[in-house]
Every structure is written in structure tokens, then in C-alpha cells.
Amino acid sequence: MSASDALNSCPHVALLLSSGMGHLTPCLRFAATLVQHHCRVTIITNYPTVSVAESRAISLLLSDFPQITEKQFHLLPFDPSTANTTDPFFLRWEAIRRSAHLLNPLLSSISPPLSALVIDSSLVSSFVPVAANLDLPSYVLFTSSTRMCSLEETFPAFVASKTNFDSIQLDDVIEIPGFSPVPVSSVPPVFLNLNHLFTTMLIQNGQSFRKANGILINTFEALEGGILPGINDKRAADGLPPYCSVGPLLPCKFEKTECSAPVKWLDDQPEGSVVYVSFGSRFALSSEQIKELGDGLIRSGCRFLWVVKCKKVDQEDEESLDELLGRDVLEKIKKYGFVIKNWVNQQEILDHRAVGGFVTHGGWNSSMEAVWHGVPMLVWPQFGDQKINAEVIERSGLGMWVKRWGWGTQQLVKGEEIGERIKDLMGNNPLRVRAKTLREEARKAIEVGGSSEKTLKELIENWKKTSRKT
């Protein structure tokens, strides 16, 4: 086969991007993965992005992978006052959804013709019909755990089954196929507000998952306890699309940031002695909780690397560390650890020999990065899917979480308790052993013949068949 014939036989896959780094990061990683598996890739973007971090990530991806094509999706004007939320990401999702009919001509104009459309999970209900209208296979890229995916699919039926939804109690449970029931106390509070824009989108998306050709999830079979094949057999019998484990989706070169000071500090620390503390880009702890966390880190007696964030998204923090923590506390902290307000290269930190534990919000991307590097976690959920993810991490044996930490219960966690939990994490040898085991399983999953590698190959072969029909 000539080089041109080989290129022509490659499937051409478009990825419809959403907004928010928690959604964008796995989409861009999946785009890079497809290129590495010899697929043509087009990403469909919309500007201006909500945050600078998003536009930067897209630009760096395109710079590192010049073979990826970008198509800009121009959105209709959208008046945010017509939506009952001020969240900039929810508003962007709605703006994209309302412009769905404009995507048809854009997809039709792409050359060579597309083999498949991969849609971010926040946009499914509006764009699966667009793909179907073009006789184009569509796939959901789900950006959280399989357990969370099953909950989102099941939630519309759960809502429909309740004659009085307002009577739901926190100790009620939601039955989800293939998994243990989800306590309502672990469900994001916004799910329980049926008048909220997010919940409207959630229910519509959950109903539309079944209309896609497959649901791609950043996970691997060993992390799921080997239950995915059985779940997919049942889904096939019920006429539902399969859960396709395509993870772990690895961090790419374009994600690296220049921040050498923390790494230099880590180089001087003993192996496995440092707890890394970071709560992601989407949520900021209150100033009171930041002070208690600082006190807890000191009380733990452990070395630590702490990324302090007091503003949401990628806004610059105006308060200095002195103002946030107080000069006396900051001086004590400097004796034990390294504190930084800038973002760090999380992959480089987690991969460092000195890091032996991770205090995290439980975002799925961060959780999968910890799995990849074999770092046990203390999960402190803050919002969204993070309590569900904490359950997954705990059941996998990779981490621990305190159920009364987070929304709906204890509002301010005191430093004394934080310190004790960090000591528990850093002294837990079974967690370390399990983390190393899952680290090896994660690598096996994407090697030739691994569970995720085989799944991806099967997808690509199916897309090649679509290419030959066009």
C-alpha cells in the first residue's frame, strides 16, 4: 500500500469541544491519542473561550500536533439573562446547544468526509441528532467515571419515577445498572434543582446517551474491578451503546508548564515523604478553610507541596500568601513545606519520587493522573461529580475520603482533623501497595493487547468501515 493509500484509509474523526478545563483536557488528550493511532483529526472549537487556560491549551495542542485541523464553530448571539444561572461554563454550554443547527453545514463541508463525530458529554442531546441527520456515527466522550456516567443515564428515569421530587431525602438512594446504589447525599446538589439550567441539560443529555453509537470513558477495566464486560453484555441485550474504556488518556507535551522551583524543592526531599495538595482550577476554598488547611498541614508533621488557590477558574489571585495565611502561619509552613500560588506541572509533581500522597478535590482528570503515577489519594470533594469519584477511588483501594467533608454536612473542617487524616494517608502502606499495582495495570491497559488499546483499535476499525462507505 502506498503512503497516499494508507492516508486515504485512515478514519477521519471530528471532536466537538465544550468548555471548562475538566471537559476540554480529556478531549484534547483523546485528539492526541487518535493522531498517535494514525487517524485524521479535526477539532471543532468556539471562541472566545471562557478562560485563558482553554485557549492556551487549544493553541498548544495545535502547535504540537500540526496534523490536527481546527474548524471554528461560530455561535449565535446568546443573552445570558435568559438563563437562570451565572455560571460562565453552563452559559457557554447552552450557547453551543442553541447553535446546534449551524453545525450541519460545517460538518458537511469537512474534507475528506468524516467517519465519526465525538461529542463532549455536556452537549449530547443537541448534537447526536445533527450527526444522525448526516448518517454519521456519533460517540459521547464522557469526562468522569463510569459510575458517574451510569448515574447520568439513569437520572432522567429516577426523576420521572418521583411524583413528588421535592420529598427526596439525603439518605435515599438511586439504583444504577451494574453498580451499587448512589446515595442522594453524594449527588451534586444542583441535580436536585429541576428548575436549574444545568439540570435541564443533564436530563436531556442523559436521555440522549442511548442514541449514540458508543460512550467513550477515560478509564480502564482494572480500575473498574473487571465489571465492564458484564455491564456491556447487559447493555447490548437492552439495545444500549457500549461503555468503551479508552483510558488512561495521558497528559501531553502541550500541557507542560515552566515552574521549576517546586521540582527543585522536591529534589531535596526523601522518597515518598511529601504530600501534594491541590484542588484544581474550578473551585477555590474559602479563606477560612485555607487557614485551617495550613494548620492541618503543619499539625500532620509531613512535608508538603501546596498549591494555594483562592479564585476560581484561571483568574489571578490578588491576595498574597501573607494575607491569606498570616505571616506567623506562613513562617511555620516554610519550615515544613513549599507553598505556591502559581499552577504547577501536576504530572511532573505526581511522578516525582518524593511525592507519597495527594490531597485532591477528586476531579476525574486529577484522579486518573494519580492512578497513572501510582500516588494514593485523600479525596476532599468540593462540588460536581467529586463525591461519586471519591467512592470509586475508595472502592478501588487507591485512596480514602471522609464522608462528612464537603457539601451538605460539615462546613468548616478544622486543622486538627485535617492533620490526622493526612498522617493516616501518608502512613497507609496498603494504599501505597495498591497504588503501585494500579499504576502497572494502567500501563498494561494502553499497551498492545491491553483492554483500552483493544477497545480503541476496534473503534478505529469500525470507523474505517464508515470511511469506505463515504
Curated annotation (Swiss-Prot):
Q: Which family does it belong to?
A: Belongs to the UDP-glycosyltransferase family.
* SUPFAM superfamilies in alphabetical order: UDP-Glycosyltransferase/glycogen phosphorylase
- Provide a Gene Ontology MF annotation, just one: UDP-glucosyltransferase activity
> EC number(s) of the enzyme?
2.4.1.-
PANTHER family xrefs: GLYCOSYLTRANSFERASE, UDP-GLYCOSYLTRANSFERASE 708D1-LIKE
Does Glycosyltransferase appear among the keywords? yes
Q: In its UniProt entry, what is this protein called?
A: UDP-glycosyltransferase 13
Q: According to the lineage, what is the superkingdom? A: Eukaryota
Enzyme class, first EC level, given as a word: transferase
The record's function comment reads: Benzophenone C-glycosyltransferase involved in the biosynthesis of mangiferin. Exhibits a robust regio- and stereospecific C-glycosylation activity toward over 35 substrates from 18 structurally different types with UDP-glucose. Also able to produce O- and N-glycosides and to use UDP-xylose as sugar donor. Generates only C-glycosides with 2,4,6-tri-hydroxy acceptors at the A ring, both C- and O- glycosides with 2,4-di-hydroxyl acceptors at the A ring, and only O-glycosides with 2- or 4-mono-hydroxy acceptors at the A ring.
**Which segments of the protein form a coiled coil according to its record?**
none
Q: How does activity depend on pH?
A: Optimum pH is 9.0.
Q: How does activity depend on temperature?
A: Optimum temperature is 45 degrees Celsius.
- What UniProt keywords apply to this chain's record, in alphabetical order? Glycosyltransferase, Transferase
